[in-house]
């Protein structure tokens, strides 16, 4: 058997760096439980360029970013979770930078790195909110599901931003909407892990 050209290219990437930075970092625990307070996150000197440069200098071709782990905390400002994400950290409120993932992506591009995302299907925060594992029925949903004052409404109405229909549970719709955000608003995402 011979690998396809795409498979051979993937093998040639060599090392993939894994960046797992989130709310659990500030609670000295491996996994969060969904009840952690984002306002505890207030680092000084956060330098995503330094992170990306370190990966590039180490010979990595791509960084896999944990954008949401099992605790449900997100490194970006999601329309679908407005409480347990980077926008609610003390550092975001102090600096006005509500989207750490966007900074990481920009730094990765600056240093020639591809970006992948790790998105955990488990979500302790949404379980506490009654969304994850609530045994809801699969009903047809439109993805993206526009929220109040959604900045994408014009693009959806004009057809510039595609939509699709899918039968999903409450959490399935939440997850699909977040993946839609991540895969349409951050440029080229090379790989997705669950």
Q: What is each of the regions a protein language model found here?
A:
Residues 1-194:
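Mature catalytic domains of secreted/periplasmic carbohydrate-active enzymes
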């Amino acid at each position: 058997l011979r690998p396809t050209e795409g498979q051979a290219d993937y093998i040639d990437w060599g090392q993939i760096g894994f960046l797992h930075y989130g709310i659990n970092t500030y609670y000295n625990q491996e996994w969060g439980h969904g009840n952690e307070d984002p306002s505890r996150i207030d680092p000084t000197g956060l330098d995503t360029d330094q992170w990306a440069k370190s990966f590039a200098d180490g010979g990595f071709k791509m960084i896999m970013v944990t954008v949401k782990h099992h605790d449900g905390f997100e490194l970006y400002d999601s329309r679908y979770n407005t409480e347990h994400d980077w926008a609610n950290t003390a550092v975001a409120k102090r600096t006005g930078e509500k989207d750490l993932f966007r900074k990481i992506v920009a730094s990765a591009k600056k240093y020639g790195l591809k970006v992948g995302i790790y998105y955990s299907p488990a979500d302790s925060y949404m379980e506490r909110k009654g969304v994850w594992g609530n045994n809801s029925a699969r009903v047809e949903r439109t993805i993206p599901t526009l929220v109040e004052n959604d900045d994408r409404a014009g693009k959806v109405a004009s057809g510039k931003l595609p939509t699709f229909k899918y039968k999903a549970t409450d959490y399935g719709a939440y997850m699909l909407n977040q993946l839609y955000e991540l895969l349409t608003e951050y440029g080229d995402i090379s790989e997705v892990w669950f």
